[in-house]
């Protein structure tokens, strides 16, 4: 048996062990979070509220009606941004790639703010805000890739990053201009733009969960091709990988994940940058193993 096979055999338990530890940490952190707040609630009361809910108990109502929905929103947002960050860094082959830096969050925010300023309501179509945010993120990142691909040399990681920062600044400026000119939109969106989990309900989370799950499914579907893509375009072409299709599917997954996260909690940065590096320390560069771990790490 070769050394490579021995090393791979030794590494196999690591992703499972890491997933188990992350799950336990996530459960413990969630229980602590549900007890924290303006009114401290003991862990045993939190467990009783989750297992044997009594609507007549005031503390249990605080947990189930207020804190639980915020916890679910935080978990969904962190998991979506973590997976999106890992996927983005893999697609563009840049360890500094992050939805906030490359303009996806800014594009999603601009789309939501613009539709609100135009008076378009999301009430008749509950999934409207997540899909609008996803379209905004996808369009702006598509513009980043098109701008970075222009000229000689193609879309190098450095050019993608520079174009992303430039278009992100432009989208943020347009968003600020809309808010300055429309006071009603400013009042409706100012807390959301700062990154806020207050005022959410289960209906909002359910509609945001659909694009997030679709994005995760697409990411897992193209994970084997992304491993080959990480070796370089020439190698990937030689092994029969359709580069355009793979990158478009990756863009679709990233846009859906970012759209779901932004629709719930507003534009939040840094999570998509740090999570991929943490995951790579826990497992290998294999995207098939890293993707399932990016969600709990981001949620934490």
PLM-predicted stretches and their roles:
Residues 2-300:
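Alpha-helical transmembrane segments in inner-membrane proteins
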């Amino acid at each position: 048996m070769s050394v490579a096979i021995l090393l791979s055999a030794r590494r196999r338990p690591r992703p499972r062990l890491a997933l188990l530890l992350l799950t336990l940490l996530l459960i413990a952190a969630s229980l602590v979070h549900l007890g924290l707040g303006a009114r401290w609630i003991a862990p045993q009361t939190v467990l009783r509220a989750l297992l044997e809910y009594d609507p007549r108990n005031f503390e249990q109502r605080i947990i189930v009606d207020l804190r639980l929905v915020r916890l679910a929103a935080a978990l969904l947002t962190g998991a979506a941004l973590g997976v999106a960050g890992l996927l983005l860094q893999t697609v563009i082959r840049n360890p500094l790639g992050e939805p906030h830096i490359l303009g996806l969050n800014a594009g999603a925010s601009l789309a939501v703010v613009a539709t609100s300023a135009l008076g378009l309501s999301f009430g008749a179509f509950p999934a409207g805000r997540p899909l609008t945010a996803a379209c905004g993120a996808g369009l702006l990142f598509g513009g980043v890739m098109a701008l970075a691909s222009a000229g000689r040399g193609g879309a190098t990681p450095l050019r993608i990053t520079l174009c992303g920062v430039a278009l992100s600044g432009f989208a943020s400026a347009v968003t600020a201009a809309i808010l300055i000119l429309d006071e009603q939109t400013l009042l409706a969106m100012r807390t959301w733009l700062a990154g806020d989990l207050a005022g959410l309900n289960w209906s909002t989370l359910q509609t945001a969960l659909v694009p997030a799950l679709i994005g995760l499914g697409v990411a897992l579907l193209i994970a084997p091709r992304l491993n080959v893509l990480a070796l370089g375009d020439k190698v990937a072409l030689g092994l029969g990988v359709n580069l355009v299709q793979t990158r478009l599917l990756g863009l679709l997954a990233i846009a859906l994940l970012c759209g779901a996260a932004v629709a719930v909690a507003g534009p939040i940065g840094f999570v998509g940058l740090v999570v991929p590096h943490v995951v790579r320390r826990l497992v290998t560069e294999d995207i098939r193993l890293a993707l399932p771990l990016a969600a709990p790490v981001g949620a934490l």
